[in-house]
Amino acid sequence: MTVLRPFYVPIVHGAMDGRPDEADSIESADAICETLHRLGYASDIVHIDLDLTPLERMMEREPLVVFNLVDGLRADLRLQPFVPAFLEKLRVPYTGCRFDAIVAAMSKTRSKHLMKAAGIATPAWIDGIRNPLPGDTLVLVKSDSEHASVGIDATSVVMACEAQKVIRHREATFGGRFFAEVFIEGREFNVAMVDGPIGVEVLPPPEILFAGYPDDKPKIVDYDAKWQTESFAYQNTPRQFGIEKTDPKLGRKLKKMAAEVWNTFGLTGYARVDFRVDAMGKPWAIDVNTNPCITADAGFSATASEAGISYPQLIERIVQAALRRTAPAELDEVLGDPLRAGEARVGEAGAW
């Protein structure tokens, strides 16, 4: 009698302990591993740095899909595309966005160039060389590569005439390259998207509220708001759903623009686009997030839940999206029919 072993879906990350935004990847890996086991997969967590040995050992087990949570190696975000490139060379399916999309979104200024060329509204910006904005324009100084609000606090909102000085100070303090974009005073929304059997599904957009913020405190999602659980910002920036009912026109605009970003960057698997909305109700795309945080209590997971997608269903859908990128004939020949089996698991997961 032949006993079929479970399909192997390892989880790969390169996070290091020490920073809350790094610990986020470790928490995601733990939650996803537990969920994959409950869905019937074999899974473990593979931590990597610049040594390829763990990846080589993982490949010996012939993974069905690699669940990619790598957003950098040894805290160097420039190495985020390393694992996708390695897996693409070996023709191994992996979750989330592909190598080329990750590279395109790694630099915020490069992302803004792409969005501007595609006709997607994004705030004007200043780099470290030129300053085309009037000096009294409010701008937000932020990292070109960090996607966790690293280096952003209340003092990041300044006049354009002060931007170059603040950019140089931030670069000296945090390293890397900083720039400044026009600060859109108004509301903030996150729009999450996940691949489905017939294409991308744009999930309900939550608004980030700035509850009880004093007039002199910039209404921004800074580092404290994301990671410092005891801070005023963290405790006073809840998310609120329902924009599709309270302002259907704005809800449609946000979803349409998010889908345009998905197509422009060639996003796959799952992604998130952050928006500011000005006083006239115009959305501005400010950040493109490939493979955003998907811990069980993360904003992305809460958004999926609002759309009726449970956490196990979300994880299964991300796995299935990776499989769909592989030629069906090749999958059938090598693996049988994991796509159909996955559809059954998704149905079962709804009751879990």
Residue ranges: model-predicted function:
Residues 48, 178-182, 189-190, 266-280:
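A short glycine-rich, hydrophobically flanked beta-strand micro-motif that places a catalytic Asp/Glu
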Residues 15-17, 71-73, 144-146, 291:
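Short glycine-rich anion-binding loops that position phosphate/pyrophosphate groups of nucleotides
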Residues 50, 72, 101, 128-129, ...:
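Conserved beta-strand edge residues that scaffold enzyme active sites
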Residues 1-14, 58-63, 102-188, 196-198:
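Active-site nucleotide/adenylate-binding loops and adjacent lid/helix of ATP-dependent enzymes
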Residues 17, 21-22, 26-124:
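Conserved N-proximal alpha/beta basic substrate-recognition cap immediately N-terminal to
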Residues 244-352:
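ATP-dependent carboxylate activation and anion-phosphoryl transfer catalytic cores
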Residues 160-256, 284:
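Phosphate-binding site of ATP-dependent enzymes
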